[in-house]
Amino acid sequence: MLLCLAAISSAQTITGTITGTVTDASGAIVPNVKITATNEGTAVQTTATANNAGIYSLPFLPVGQYTITAEGAGFKKSVLGPFPVEVNQVVRMDVSLVVGAVAETVEVTAVAPPLQTETTQTGQTLSTKRLTDLPLNGRNIVSAMLLIPGAVQTNPGSVNTASRFSGRAFVNGNREQTNNFLLDGVDVNDSMDNRIGYTPSVDALQEVQVMTGNGSSEFGNSAGAVVNMTLKSGSNDFHGSLFHFFRNDNLDANSFFANQNTALPKDKQRRTFQQNMYGGTLGGRIIRDSCSSLETMKERNGEIAALRSPALLRPIGV
């Protein structure tokens, strides 16, 4: 059952690509160089060989931090990274080799943040750190959409009390029903009103890419934003987190109108409000460099949402 859940079939991109050109110190093209990309979290390696034009491409990489190694006859081994690869992103990482013995290594760790120069797509990617650090109302990922340029909502509080025709952002002047929500490439839109049909725990998300314009043809069905959410996966190391968000009426300020209700004592004038939200994540390896799993749980006011995200790691060299 675990192995069956690990394989996801999707028409929407939930991975990234690393590409670039290999040259020597003079700028001349160097073909037939072996390029290896290593995922820092899972230690999974993906390899490719630069073609006659010195160009290499490593597609379908799970999001995360990567280091690339370049090895060619007559040149020192070159190591670049780590650097991030985001969902649906093409990272250009050119490699410059230095003449010398293969046993020698040139390591470059101060890598500039990759710029998105391969597409004209507009939008923004929210990392897991930014998502967990933000004071999102109700810990609802839809609230984060309001941080994206071009997104507005006349009633921001409605994201947690969504009824028909509410609870989402208006993006680039389009109606709120024109947004498209994807989770690991799977459509999670509410079939009745196109709201988000399933809201994962913020702590379960690796990153959220909000595309607002010039998206590729694979992301159809939306004139507004495409919200492409990617779940975390396990890694070779065991890791986890716990959280508890607490609010009640003792933490809220009183309102002008509540103060006018003199029939009630002062401590009863404010509307009763209590909110407890707690949960956590736990992930780690099942088999080192081969299989891992991540478990998450969130409870809000007695309603429990659980998510299991097993992941099969690709064999080294594939």
State where each predicted segment sits.
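Conserved protein kinase catalytic core
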Residues: 30, 190, 302-304
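Periplasmic N-terminal accessory/gating domains of Gram-negative outer-membrane beta-barrel systems
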Residues: 51, 75-233, 248, 252, ...
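Short, small-residue-rich packing micro-motifs
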Residues: 66, 241-247
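Outer-membrane beta-barrel proteins
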Residues: 44, 249-253, 302-306
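Structural recognition of the beta-strand scaffold that forms the well-ordered cores
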Residues: 180-182, 244, 293-294
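Periplasm-facing N-terminal accessory domains of Gram-negative outer-membrane beta-barrel systems
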Residues: 2-127
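Transmembrane beta-barrel wall of Gram-negative outer-membrane proteins
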Residues: 234, 239, 269-318
